Amino acid sequence: MSAKEIKFGQDARSLILSGVNQLADAVKVTLGPKGRNVVIDRSFGAPLITKDGVSVAKEIELEEKFENMGAQLVKEVASKTSDVAGDGTTTATVLAQGIYREGVKLVTAGHNPMEIKRGIDKAVEAAVAYLQELSKPIKDHKEIAQVGTISANSDKTIGDIIAEAMEKVGKEGVITVEEAKAMETSLETVEGMQFDRGYLSPYFVTDAERMEAVMEDAMILIHDKKISNMRDMINILEAVAKQGRPLLIIAEDIEGEALATLVVNRLRGTLNVAAVKAPGFGDRRKAMLEDIAILTGGKVISEEVGFKLENATIDMLGNAKRIVIDKENSTIIDGAGSEVDIQGRVKQIRAQIEETKSDYDREKLQERLAKLVGGVAVVKVGAATETEMKEKKARVEDALHATRAAVEEGIVPGGGVALIRCIKAIESLDLPGEQNWGVNIVKRAMEEPLRQISANAGAEGSIVVNQVRGGADTYGFNAAADEYCDMIEAGIIDPTKVVRSALQNASSVAGLMLTTEACIAELPKEEAGGGMPGGMPGGMPGGMGGMGGMM
């Protein structure tokens, strides 16, 4: 085990503070509408240009071990806030720096750090309770667009696209972000349930121009095994032909005689039919087939539950208003499943999402959920260069997370104003002894985001803070326009969840750093190769002589 270096008390705290300051100072230049960019060198490709706090924080590693501890702890604040709320990483970093910096001064002056931490915790608890009071539920499309715009660094186009996507697929719908081939950022939506399996034969196509098989008021046969023998399907096909309605067959595979017969019937016009493979693999395939069955009001014809294909009847088939199948995807629109069954299935999938530990499984479950309740929207991000595309895509993802957070917990005035309003809630706290110092630290730290937004906009932070503190609840400083106004009316709003997470995560880590009395790190290793150049010339001739003797 290698030797360790230990630092105690003030020595340890001042080194941690130095690390915290280096990381926070690099991150906080990005805060607010007039925040600056940070350029990050990478070992491959072009440098990354970003205004995203967490991207800057993740790149920082300091050479000095004890300083690096401070930087890594604040990086944890930014990452956790990003994971929980999707935005607010820079605010969280600025708050953590403010709480720790003020706290270190008091601990150095001889105050008890444990009591200070208790005071910080109680102050944050009171502030969070006041935030919930201040919070208003999101009302309309316009407010969703405003939240998206603020999170995307005041890019109105992104805000509008995200609001439109949420309107189209609902609050539960899946919205994904992809890189576009063109310069423009656009939105594509898929209504109904879409899965990534196309027609098994181009002879099923009904619209030759678009190479699509389109079926109106269709029936759906869902089977979990391969179909290769036509005899198994004769009964059900005859029953469907009598109804005179189109039929979609979804099975593990359809091949040989069965596929050939379906194609011949389709070409002769005897039966309007199309066949696709079942989506997914293994257990996920079974679950997706069950989803399709519930959505369309049909049953999965499976021997596992006692249904054989040759005994299938019309009432086992699903129904849908419209089905569109192209070479790669099938879309079922307006299935005839009962609302009660669909909601039951949705509840079941939500429970699985809560329980699963795997990110991949969670993503797949969320996709299934979206297909049942709303649909899927894809935001295609376009830009002139790859560097701009990456930066823009990160902003779109931030904006998307923030709008989801706003829908979840509501909104508060933005621009650091909500935290300023929480100060009066914690001023009324009456705590014993040194805990009051903890309250004072939080009061001072809550001004920091507004100070930094003002400083980045070229204004004097202290003057702005005083002016805003004297105003009404929603009164604040619009840094983009350099004026004081009603923040809600100006569309400068933050999701409550983002502000809450930033404050809680910052105080949690800063409080732990304050109560640190010793730090341990590995000693830097001595370079072992110092004596080698001198040793080699002396060693080699002897060795060579030995070899000569052997020969």
From Swiss-Prot:
One Gene Ontology term, aspect cellular component: cytoplasm
Top-level taxon: Bacteria
Entry keyword Cytoplasm: yes
Keyword match Transmembrane helix: no
Subcellular localization, as worded in the UniProt entry: Cytoplasm
Catalytic function, reaction form: ATP + H2O + a folded polypeptide = ADP + phosphate + an unfolded polypeptide
Protein name, per record: Chaperonin GroEL
Gene name per UniProt: groEL
